[in-house]
Amino acid sequence: MDEFQRNSNKHRSWQQFFLYPLFFREDLXAIAHYHHLDRSGSSEPTEILVSNFLSFLTVKRSXRRIRKQNNSISLLGNSDSNKLIEYNKNSSFQLILEGFTIVLEALFAMRSKXFXKGMDGWNSFRSIHCIFPFMEAKLPHSBYISDLRVPYSIHPEILVRIFRRWIRDVPSLHLLRSILHEWKKSFNRENLQKALITQRENTRFSLFLWNSYVYECESFLIPLIKRILNSQSLLYGSFPDRTHFEKKIKDIVLFPPHKISPKKIWLLKDSFIHYVRYGERSLIALKGTHLQVKKCRYHLFHFWQYYFHLWFQPYRICSLELSKTSFSFLGFFMHVKMRPLVVRAKMLDDLFITDLITNELNSTAPIRSILFSLAKEKFCDISGWPISKLSWTSLSDDDIXDRFDRIWXXLFHYYSGSINQDGLYHIKYILLLSCAKTLACKHK
């Protein structure tokens, strides 16, 4: 893959215009075959591994036959002999899809690097461990927050149009269109709207589609929001701490002089924005006025409706004032709380005591949701009373204790920074008593 990316940098025009011949190279099909075996693992029976290898040979022979044909042949035909459209049953389709994804991933990696270099003034963090320190440092200084859910109901033709912006190879686009439409047919009608995006954890191709879709959204969304904030500064009332005045109201000639109040000074308010995303949830923290928040919300609605040609449900974006309401993100309930501090300042021979008020971000663990999950997994009843885990009674004592210990350690490590530690110890009590009842039920 590294060698392919280095060669593609030298011949970028060839890479963009002639991708279709790469999909039928035998070495690319071999790479896809080994990727498919590594993901399946070595625990599969020998018959399945042999079947996959034979399918690889079938794809290899098909690629040779297609190269020798003069007429164009559709890989996804409806003939009885060609079973490539059987997405869940035939691994030949998986290998072709794997090779198709490998080529597109290399192009996507180079395109995303160019996008990151062009975003001046924006710091990008790609680890979940950076989210909480970032939010604790930035959100207390923000006024509003917009909770945005990325739309997942998207038509295959919209994805084809996204790839058309950076791939101009017409045969490759036709192949992508055929794959997307045949893949969409493999889902029933109930899951038709969520087939392309919400199944992203199943295959490498699904994950690539999701990353491409989110990248396309953010590549236009972030500059759009930045342009909205920098387009026009909004005026607001007098603040005595500001010494650098942009304009005074007496200098404005749009109003008669007798209607101007000399006691009120109008200043320009500085605005900034922070953007955080995890999965399909995005948070846009904004320091500014309520009018700027409404303006940003208006442009977000029209961005998805006119750019992606899909209806953006109003409930998918919610604007909140941080000082009055709380919000949920990554399994926490978060709210900004004012914290009063008493500061002693000494100037020459005098000692002053001043009150300083700062904002801090408090996170609360959702104890009720955790109890509901434990009740669903039969660790306790709906009221929170511990019960024995009957499905684990066939395990050894060490395995039972180890499983309970891992559950508690995972919960404690994730929610250890929350302010409601009493609720976490109540969860620990439920797990300990459920473990004891499970062991007692086993040795009864």
UniProtKB/Swiss-Prot annotation:
UniProt keyword annotation of tRNA processing present: yes
Annotated disulfide bonds: none
GO biological process, alphabetically ordered: mRNA processing; tRNA processing
Alphabetized GO MF terms: RNA binding
This protein's record includes keyword Lipid metabolism: no
Keyword terms: Chloroplast, mRNA processing, Plastid, RNA-binding, tRNA processing
InterPro entries according to UniProt: Domain_X, Maturase_MatK, Maturase_MatK_N
Subcellular location: Plastid, Chloroplast
Any one Gene Ontology cellular component term annotated for this protein: chloroplast
Regions crossing the membrane: none
Major localization listed first in the record, in broad terms: plastid
Role of this protein: Usually encoded in the trnK tRNA gene intron. Probably assists in splicing its own and other chloroplast group II introns.
Record family assignment: Belongs to the intron maturase 2 family. MatK subfamily.
Protein name stated in the entry: Maturase K
Organism of this sequence: Chamaecyparis lawsoniana
Lineage: Eukaryota, Viridiplantae, Streptophyta, Embryophyta, Tracheophyta
